[in-house]
Amino acid sequence: MGDNYSTYLLDIEGTVCPISFVKETLSPYFTKKVPQLVQQDTRDSPVSNILSQFHIDDKEQLQAHILELVAKDVKDPILKQLQGYIWAQGYESGQIKAPVYADAIDFIKRKKRVFIYSSGSVKAQKLLFGYVQDPNAPAHDSLDLNSYIDGYFDINTSGKKTETQSYANILRDIGAKASEVLFLSDNPLELDAAAGVGIATGLASRPGNAPVPDGQKYQVYKDFETL
């Protein structure tokens, strides 16, 4: 069925990598770093410009606010910038590697036009795909898939993933017709929003993903080998 499309738009969490990666690896790494980051912040620190955008002067209140956003899974663009900054340190130091599914790695490598759309910042997306755990090599080895990806979109570039206009924005930016694009995600609200502009959709059904009510109304993909 994948041969019917020239362009693929992929979600990340629960689609190309386990949904547990964010909850069990990325989020704990971030929250562990927040107290030190906030308390040691100065006007000259690299992260000062990001923290100042929260407009909270008291450091204890700022720290509590950031951790609350994480706990409530708020898709805040400033939080996403801050997470990208901290995760960069983890990826570059070798402490974090992305467990992208082997079939997703193969899919990204063999398809001509692949784009990524995630609520995580574009910077965080590039880091994730730049430090992918190589499934065929020792644990310390990683793959860089960025050269195979044609573009990245987030809530700052395109809008919220549950809004139809966001997908219209992406179609405009990639210069594609809706009929040429297949969007894959584990979130039915995102699939419905994309379908609103005529984009074909596929529900990613990966281990650990939450059950989807009325899942039978979607084309379901347990892996990407058939695409």
Swiss-Prot record:
Pathway: Amino-acid biosynthesis; L-methionine biosynthesis via salvage pathway; L-methionine from S-methyl-5-thio-alpha-D-ribose 1-phosphate: step 3/6; Amino-acid biosynthesis; L-methionine biosynthesis via salvage pathway; L-methionine from S-methyl-5-thio-alpha-D-ribose 1-phosphate: step 4/6. Its main location: cytoplasm. The keyword Transferase does not apply. It is an enzyme of class 3 (hydrolase). Its EC number is 3.1.3.77. GO terms for biological process: L-methionine salvage from methylthioadenosine. Substrate binds at S118, S119, K161. GO terms for molecular function: acireductone synthase activity; magnesium ion binding. Keywords: Amino-acid biosynthesis, Cytoplasm, Hydrolase, Magnesium, Metal-binding, Methionine biosynthesis, Nucleus. Its cofactor is Mg(2+). Monomer. Belongs to the HAD-like hydrolase superfamily. MasA/MtnC family. This is Enolase-phosphatase E1. The gene is UTR4.
